[in-house]
Amino acid sequence: MLTIATLHVALQVFGAFSPSHAAAVTLEHRSARDGNSVAVPANWDVYGYLFNVTVGSPPQNITMLSDMTWMAPFVRSGRCLGQFNPELCVAQGQSFFNEHNSTTFANTTFAQATWPVTAFAPNFTVDYGRDKFCIGEICNKDTLMQVSDFPYPGSVVPVIPFGGIFGLAPTPEAITATSEPVNFQAWKNGKMGPLVGWHTCEVLKSAATCQGGDAQLVFGGTDTTMYSAKKLQSYEIQNPEWLSDAFYPSTPPRSNYWSTSLTGMWIRTDKLSKNYAVPFKAVKTAKRTPPLAVVDEGSEGLGAPLSLNGYKYLVRHIKSAKLASKAIVQNIQQQGSSGYNTADQDWYTVACDGLHEYPDLVYQLDGRKKYTISAGDYVTKLTDMPGSVCYLNINVWKYGRTENGDARVVLLGRAFLKRKYLVLNFEDRSFGLAPLRTG
């Protein structure tokens, strides 16, 4: 989930996984010096994938939201309005980290930071502290983390089913301590390797490889039973200066997303459409540049990515496509199966059968490998409607649009990732994709 996206969701009850469910799997390491690995299951919630860690001494269980665009770890605390007062600062039912119950917690001299707009709370204000942070059995002492200190009582913030955010964004080229994810800090201290492996079990016959969850994260390595290393295509991240202001102005500017150039985006019927990955001028004085594709495993990127112009072309080439009624649009939004910040686009219903006749969506990253999303992964059934009602689950992302209907940024989310194994490499600042073994 992009850190400053606007969410309007109904809260759901989440059965958190215990850290004891972390398991040993067949893992890949870059070298023996890189340290250990641990695999943990994650469960899907309307906000994204959630999993458990422990923080402090003695350990406190904290359910974390996985976020590949967040940086240093964040925990809800008993602080607000510049004071420690859990009764005032934490709403009833909200989980949080109680620093006063940890013998190893320490404040730091890093300046307090505030983000005026976020998905979770306005004027999102944090202090910085250090404490022991464990993923499964792998622990890193003195992990630097964001500790909430909102400028209002806890009752202002809705109760959410997690007590922290586990940032998985790559570190910027100019690394600062406050931009380092938990696993990066642990890798620097020799506790684990520099890789993070990720896959979802959505298209698999069972959830065994996700330890009964919806997805599995491997910290410090990858699960080599789920992909062939020979088929892994890696991409060095590309974070041009204009990307930092593409969504929301940020000070200092952000330059750390898992992103690469999108050099091809086609709709394939009996032939390929024109290429909808249209180069554009990011700034008036610059040369034309290809749009970017940003990896986002969370609730922003659920649908298959297209530009508005590409979406219109797709609709024209599906005979059963009809503009959805207001009632159906409401059901789409309530079901939570499509990305947020798509409110400006039209929605279309389509026939639920004959998907093999629908077009494929084809993408090319950085002038190299091409990837395909078939109709079975971009046509979604509405579960709370009588009869069989399906719709085009396409993400024309609000913040990636250009005025003429092209896209400057698309999100590689669930529809794109569900049949792939994803490798995040924090040492090389690259990400890799390989076909997910489904047998």
Curated annotation (Swiss-Prot):
The keyword Signal applies. GO terms for molecular function: aspartic-type endopeptidase activity. Disulfide bonds join C352-C390. The keyword Ion transport does not apply. One of its GO terms (biological process) is proteolysis. It is an enzyme of class 3 (hydrolase). InterPro entries: Aspartic_peptidase_A1, Pepsin-like_dom, PEPTIDASE_A1, Peptidase_aspartic_dom_sf. PROSITE patterns: PEPTIDASE_A1. The active site is at D67, D296. GO terms for cellular component: extracellular region. It is found in: Secreted. Glycans are attached at N52, N61, N101, N107, N123. Keywords: Aspartyl protease, Disulfide bond, Glycoprotein, Hydrolase, Protease, Secreted, Signal. Its EC number is 3.4.23.-. Residues 1-22 form the signal peptide. Pfam families: Asp (PF00026). PANTHER family: BETA-SITE APP-CLEAVING ENZYME, ISOFORM A-RELATED. Secreted aspartic protease; part of the gene cluster that mediates the biosynthesis of the mycotoxin fusarin C. Within the cluster, FUS1, FUS2, FUS8 and FUS9 are sufficient for fusarin production. The other FUS cluster members are not essential for fusarin C biosynthesis. Belongs to the peptidase A1 family. This is Secreted aspartic protease FUS4. The lineage of its organism: Eukaryota, Fungi, Dikarya, Ascomycota, Pezizomycotina.
